[in-house]
Amino acid sequence: MKIHFVGIGGIGMSAVALHEFLNGNDVYGSNIEETERTAYLRKLGIPIFVPHSADNWYDPDLVIKTPAVRDDNPEIVRARMERVPVENRLHYFRDILKREKKEEFAVTGTDGKTTTTAMVAHVLKHLKKSPTVFLGGIMDSLEHGNYEKGNGPVVYELDESEEFFSEFSPNYLIITNARGDHLENYGNSLSRYRSAFEKISRNTDLVVTFAEDELTSHLGDVTFGVKKGTYTLEMRSASRAEQKAVVEKNGKRYLELKLKVPGFHNVLNALAVIALFDSLGYDLAPVLEALEEFRGVHRRFSIAFHDPETNIYVIDDYAHTPDEIRNLLQTAKEVFENEKIVVIFQPHRYTRLEREDGNFAKALQLADEVVVTEVYDAFEERKNGISGKMIWDSLKSLGKEAYFVEKLPELEKVIPVSENTVFLFVGAGDIIHSSRRFVERYQSSKSSPSRVLGSNK
């Protein structure tokens, strides 16, 4: 079958395209711009067009699109004209799973699902279970970064941003939490959002939930939490190199967890994984070994650069909700106790910024300095009055030293550089390009430019 993927450079879309390509289908696609994923897919022999055009056409049998691709996209218009079936990525992904008929491990929720999915995959690989993995991020130990083909169970990250996720029926499901992100896709109805989690839980053999989550804790056959749940934490210690935690089960000391990845949130992610595998009757000794070896996912507190001479760090992180940002900054302050923390934050989606107005500033005030950029639209229509300046204004009202930079290409030129500083480039958009340009500029100059943010301060 010949399949045309519209938006093939997306992290979720490219994983599905890889699966179909490696299973013998004739795959090609298009993307709005060149990305690391499009370059990688090309190296494997997948033809890719950039940008979108009605001429990007090899007479496919099927067209797959992401929700971000609008119906007036020229390739979608042509597909309709030529009566070629068009399917949403998530719908098609469910069809793949039905076709595979394998044991399914799924992770969904607002925060932490990529890292938790990666942990589950890493454990199964360590146990020699040969999983097929679909990941919403890049993990070095997966053959293709966000995808690996195996002959064992299927592990996948299930995006709750689309209500259709409730139509899946994995054997085992971890719900990290449910904070109402993407509520606009549920008609801004919290009850409809809650019902989607309830529906998928009814279709699942074993559900693991965060005991302290208001919307989904009651859905868990097994729960985990800080002080509440089947699996809880008695104590935790952390250093720059590792962190340890004592885990209790039903109120009794059960085991010790060691992690190389930093952050209290990652202890909770690992606790969910322990709850899952213990409930399934796995020997926990190799599970704990795998978790201790786990090295994380790209753009999750990823140290992109360190100059030991000046003790300057540049870290990339995908955090884009207030809770994720709060977790990130708490981790940064724990790991870098004596360094200044500067956050460069790119808000992601107008709808999220409008809904979370004020919450971003509350999370960001944990940093020493904050630079806010304009919103990365993620193909949303711009909303009047919704701008990154909202966060900047809120930070200023909280008495925080903050700056606003409207044009992203200018960002790395105006970020103040000083010794003993950690620069966190944060967001789910294209802020990573600014991170790289900042490092390039720093390496070429090795100077300390004066602050030139002028009236934006």
UniProtKB/Swiss-Prot annotation:
A GO molecular function held by the record: UDP-N-acetylmuramate-L-alanine ligase activity
Predominant cellular place of this UniProt entry's protein: cytoplasm
EC number: 6.3.2.8
Top-level taxon of origin: Bacteria
Gene Ontology biological process terms from the UniProt entry: cell division; cell wall organization; peptidoglycan biosynthetic process; regulation of cell shape
Catalytic activity: UDP-N-acetyl-alpha-D-muramate + L-alanine + ATP = UDP-N-acetyl-alpha-D-muramoyl-L-alanine + ADP + phosphate + H(+)
SUPFAM superfamilies with a match to the protein in the record: MurCD N-terminal domain, MurD-like peptide ligases, catalytic domain, MurD-like peptide ligases, peptide-binding domain
Subcellular location: Cytoplasm
InterPro entries: Mur-like_cat_sf (IPR036565), Mur_ligase_C (IPR004101), Mur_ligase_C_dom_sf (IPR036615), Mur_ligase_cen (IPR013221), Mur_ligase_N (IPR000713), MurCDEF_pg_biosynth (IPR050061), UDP-N-AcMur_Ala_ligase_MurC (IPR005758)
Signal sequence bounds: none
A GO cellular-component term linked to this record: cytoplasm
Pathway recorded for this protein: Cell wall biogenesis; peptidoglycan biosynthesis
Pfam families reported in the protein's UniProt record: Mur_ligase, Mur_ligase_C, Mur_ligase_M
Residues that, per the record, bind ATP: G109, T110, D111, G112, K113, T114, T115
Record key words, sorted: ATP-binding, Cell cycle, Cell division, Cell shape, Cell wall biogenesis/degradation, Cytoplasm, Ligase, Nucleotide-binding, Peptidoglycan synthesis
This protein's record includes keyword Nucleus: no
HAMAP family linked: MurC
Family indicated by similarity: Belongs to the MurCDEF family.
Function: Cell wall formation.
Descriptive protein name: UDP-N-acetylmuramate--L-alanine ligase
